[in-house]
Amino acid sequence: MPRTLTIQRSTVPSAERANYRARLRVLRSHYSAANCRFWVFEESSLPGAFIEFTEADSEEALTVAHANAPHRILDPSRVYQEVEL
């Protein structure tokens, strides 16, 4: 079964960064407990522009993890599957 991934982009004003980071810690804990991997990157040339990746071993696991997440992503139906090369 191919691994699956969702992507979420966010622009966070500097005044909201502490709240955003706290939310990310909660999400990381949730996805870890759901056997998913969760990464967040910030664009180096545009402070406050973030991209979040959530990965699971199956689309079902990823869908369930998003459905039960404490914070919703904008479009959980946009799921990417790993391509075999």
Briefly describe each language-model feature range:
Residues 1-85:
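Short S/T/G/P-rich N-terminal loop/turn motif that feeds into the first structured element of a domain
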